[in-house]
C-alpha cells in the first residue's frame, strides 16, 4: 500500500498559488503533497555576454534548499562557500526545461531568472520546481506583455515534470521520500504539453529495469504530467 493510499498512477495533491510574494515579476508556491517550493521569476534587460548583440533572450535558473526543509538541518551552501554537484545538476535541469517553453528570439535581449527555493522536502523537489517555475515564468512573460514591452507572447507551451519509479516491484508515479529512498528504479521525466519529452533521467538503484518497465514508467509519467498540465492551466486561467 502506498502512502496516503494512493493508486500507483496517482500523483500527490498538487496546489499552485500564484503571486505568493510581491516583488518578483512571477511568484509561485507549488506544493506536491508535503513538498513545497517557492519559485520566483526575475526579468532583467540584459543577457549573458555570449548572447550580446544576437537579438535573443535567455532563461536560466537557480535552486536551493532551506536548512530545515529536511528532517535534520543542512548547512547552507553559501556558508560552505560552494554549491554541491547535486544542486548544480538540478538547476541546469530546471533551466533547460524552461528554455524549451520559450521562443528566445521573441523574448528579445532580456534574461529571466527562475529562483527555486525548497521550503519543505518530501521527494520530487526538482520536478515540483520545474512545474512551479513554469507558471512563474508565464506570469513574468505576461507582465512584459501587459506593460507593452513585448508585443507577442514567446511562450510555446507549458512544461511539467514528475517522478516515477519501481518500488517493491510496482511501477508508481510521483514518489514521496519514503518511496524514493526505497526505489529499485528512480526516474524523472520532463514533458511539453504536446507530449514531447524534454528530459528523461532514469537510474536502476537495485536490479536493472527492462525495456517493458521503461515503457510502463514513461506511460505513468505522461499520465501524471497531463494531470499537472490541467492544474497549471486552471491556475493560469487558460
Curated annotation (Swiss-Prot):
What EC identifiers does the entry list? Answer: 2.7.7.56
Could you tell me which Pfam families the record lists for this protein? RNase_PH, RNase_PH_C
Q: Which residues bind phosphate?
A: 86, 124-126
Query: What enzyme class is recorded for this protein?
Result: transferase
> Keywords for this entry?
Nucleotidyltransferase, RNA-binding, rRNA processing, Transferase, tRNA processing, tRNA-binding
The organism's place on the tree of life at top rank: Bacteria
Q: What Gene Ontology molecular-function terms does this entry list?
A: 3'-5'-RNA exonuclease activity; tRNA binding; tRNA nucleotidyltransferase activity
What are the coiled-coil residue ranges?
Answer: none
Q: Which reaction does it catalyse?
A: tRNA(n+1) + phosphate = tRNA(n) + a ribonucleoside 5'-diphosphate
Q: Which InterPro entries match?
A: ExoRNase_PH_dom1 (IPR001247), ExoRNase_PH_dom2 (IPR015847), ExoRNase_PH_dom2_sf (IPR036345), PNPase/RNase_PH_dom_sf (IPR027408), Ribosomal_Su5_D2-typ_SF (IPR020568), RNase_PH (IPR050080), RNase_PH_bac-type (IPR002381), RNase_PH_CS (IPR018336)
Whether Flavoprotein counts among this entry's keywords is no
* GO biological process, alphabetically ordered: rRNA catabolic process; rRNA processing; tRNA processing
The record's family statement is: Belongs to the RNase PH family.
Name the job this protein performs: Phosphorolytic 3'-5' exoribonuclease that plays an important role in tRNA 3'-end maturation. Removes nucleotide residues following the 3'-CCA terminus of tRNAs; can also add nucleotides to the ends of RNA molecules by using nucleoside diphosphates as substrates, but this may not be physiologically important. Probably plays a role in initiation of 16S rRNA degradation (leading to ribosome degradation) during starvation.
Q: How does it assemble?
A: Homohexameric ring arranged as a trimer of dimers.
Q: What is this protein called?
A: Ribonuclease PH
What is the species of this protein? Answer: Haemophilus influenzae (strain PittGG)
